[in-house]
From Swiss-Prot:
Pathway entry: Nitrogen metabolism
Record family assignment: Belongs to the nitrobindin family.
Species this chain originates from: Mycobacterium marinum (strain ATCC BAA-535 / M)
Binding site for heme b: K186, H213
Name of this protein: Peroxynitrite isomerase 1
Complex and partners: Homodimer.
Cofactor or coenzyme needed: heme b
HAMAP family the record matches: nitrobindin (MF_01297)
Source species taxonomy: Bacteria, Bacillati, Actinomycetota, Actinomycetes, Mycobacteriales
InterPro entries attached to this UniProt entry: Calycin, Nb(III)_bact/plant, Nitrobindin, THAP4-like_heme-bd
Amino acid sequence: MTSDASQDGPDAVAGSGDRAVAAAAERAKLTAARNIPTFDDLPLPADTANLRHGANLHDALLALLPLVGVWRGEGEGRGPHGDYRFGQQIVVSHDGGDYLNWEARSWRLDEDGQYEEPGLRETGFWRFVSDPEDDPSESQAIELLLAHSAGYVELFYGRPLTQSSWELVTDALARSRSGVLVGGAKRLYGIIEGGDLAYVEERVDADGGLVPHLSARLSRYAG
């Protein structure tokens, strides 16, 4: 099958690129002025999800810079009772330290795309492994530590695949007495066409294999 791009020729590709750049610039006029709310009476740097404001991003986090911001959109999930749609907001912020703050919360959508009920929620931190005792080949390993509202804590390790995509795999998982029983996961995040943040998550099922669990495409809301 021949793609539309090859049929239309280089001019069409260039035109599409120009339109995408123009659309991104227009969105940036709105998102550039937005940031997360903070209290201004604390004696330490405030969290910011906008690289134009607040503390400078720590040099160790430059490979994660595209993630910083507030992202909103919709996705699809697969649970024990079948497939479902959800809305989601992800906030990625920093205070100048050598880690990123991560907060993701979602809500179930009904057949009409309207809010139905609260969904999954997680909070945690991204950083790069920098232990001098580690193997030098591990110097660019990403560490993601998450606490889930469903009652478990999860530790991921991974690597940047490109300047705008990152892959992580569960290394350890601990469940509370009230927590749901889940298997490990594999996640792939990436900045895609139009500047959106997209991701897919697969989780280990009862048979021990990775199966699709979550996927979403989120647009930048702030930052």
